[in-house]
Amino acid sequence: MSEVALLVVDDSSFNRLMLKRRLAEQGYNDVTMANDGVQALAAIAARRFDCVLLDLEMPELDGIGVLERLREDPTHAPPVIVISALTEMQKIVRCIELGAEDYLPKSFDPPLLRARLGAVLEKKRLRDLADERLRLLEAELESARTAQLSLVPRDFATIAPPGLTIAAAMIPARQVGGDLYEAMRLPGGGVLLCVADVSGKGAPAGLTMARTLGAIRAAARLVPGPLPDPAAILAHANADLAADNESQTFVTAALIVLDAATGEGRICVAGHEAPYLLDAEPPRVLAGFARQPPLGAWEGFAYASCALTLAPGQGLFLYSDGVSEAEDSAQSFFGRGRLEAMLAPVALASPAAVVEATLAAVATFVDGAAQTDDITVLVIRRG
């Protein structure tokens, strides 16, 4: 048991020596001594201890004072067993409230010492094991996050055909998320734009996100014509996602195919938020779409697209509901009203400026509240 490091804190030299002897009898030889709470805190700052046996009544800084200091930074605080007299029960209760694991009477009865110290050390071992597994899991999730973010395009200057500018951002609510965006240069001189949202969050949604992105990219190459119909693209993706969909995972999507030279194209919306049109007028939602189910919900569904024309100077704002449904600490939604008010003054700005303004407005609104959904924004402007 020499690997177990213990700290004994007591202002009585007799008690310190007695406890050190009892610990040595049970195989604990790595024992550090401290005369009071000040020395104890200095020792804890200097090295790692598996357990602290802490006296209650001491000069300079007593046991309760030490526990209060340790509670201020519990990350590196070792487990504590309070050394007390049975007449100090009220103080013992206070110590437990401050985080002490157990208490030990000053008689230092060997069987009781063995049992209580052994129980505390075992709990610490299990906590350390859980912390290590959590650390490894977080490292794996961070790696997955990096891999997921690498799937979506970032170099929009090489993607956008002449006459178009594009910007986008995606912020998962967890390490990995279910939102996606796509900006894809088409061989016929056009561009494919898409924002989609997978039901659910976390790793399962992240896997479906990657699958959906792959299906859309593959379908864009399979559908014939210089400007493939977005309805046909989503129909191909739906065939892949709806087959054997036992988990009932759905994907909402808004997909646009646009001719960069003429500004003409088509749009297909599958259960998703409709884009906003950005120009000199107040931002307004594109309308006239047929209500269509999300991808994965209805196998064999025949999706339909609508004509779309983007005049020089006009832009389109595509987003996921993580923007409009962002919540503050009072669980109020950001809402479309705030979104439209935010878009109005930047409606003629560059796509990058619109994206930046959106993320800043949402961050200001939530004011540090935990993010509950993935946030994705994509903006395109012609001319």
Each predicted region: which residue ranges?
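C-terminal catalytic subdomain
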Residues: 234, 254, 306-318, 323-383
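Two-component/phosphorelay signaling modules centered on CheY-like receiver
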Residues: 13-32
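… and, occasionally, acidic/histidine-rich disordered N-termini of signaling adaptors
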Residues: 131-315, 367-383
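A Lys-centered signature of the CheY-like receiver
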Residues: 104-106
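Acidic catalytic/metal-coordinating carboxylates
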Residues: 14, 35-39, 57, 62-68, ...
